[in-house]
């Protein structure tokens, strides 16, 4: 029998429903979009052209040439940059809990910064591997920069490209302010980077932004440029981030972590104290992270709220304000908007994914 050549592509993010697609080509990017969102594609291209001269600040190489693919039938709001094949994916539905920065501008300022990071990691030995292994070789470079640093640097980018970016919102640092003494944690620092199933830990976007912004102020430059430069040329060295930080800045990740939160806590402690009139409704079990969201009053004696924890599906519970007791009244799916009450009913929406097409996600109105 003879050998035959076969070609295929990686299946990574799901398929779109049947649509007529178009493309806009420029020397730097290619916009790929369904005809139904031509206006959004052109607006996004305008933002790309606007931020391109400055999006590579702090790095020695600008963004790579990369296509942008738009998905308008997914109500979930997100974006990402990936290899295999190389592209930027945009879910065009604006985030429900967004702020004054336009959604498409935020996506461009964040995801296009990742294209800068990828381009700086795809150098030296990593670039040589890509000639042999294709984009599989380029993905090895992503191991040379921690994910929290990549996301923190991208959040800093979107914050600097706006007057009120994500990093400037009080809610973005609220969890750290509430916990206090984060920088003095000596027992288990890894949980702040890796997460925990026991304690509430802010995600790597919040952690990365705080460390990256502190490092920028502390050293007066983007320290991840040299980390990427060293890692792409020495990928065979274990822990390239640790070696590069020690070589160029005489520091390490743990030291950066402690210095960042020591500085933040000194600032937060200097702020005027505010009164706290909150009254607990129900006693929480020890060592069990539970979230109660969006409380709605039921007369003078009860409150209905969405309850989520780590081991059960989310559900609506009614809490007796006098005794603190609670009972489950309804289980939910992935809630997409804030519940409200009207005509004696609680109304909310949930995401509903198509059985056939992963990139068709609707928002279903629900009530009880």
Question: Could you describe each region identified by the protein language model?
Answer:
Residues 1-6:
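C-terminal segment of classical bacterial N-terminal signal peptides
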Residues 300-301, 343-345:
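Short coil/turn segments that connect the beta-strands within blades of beta-propeller domains
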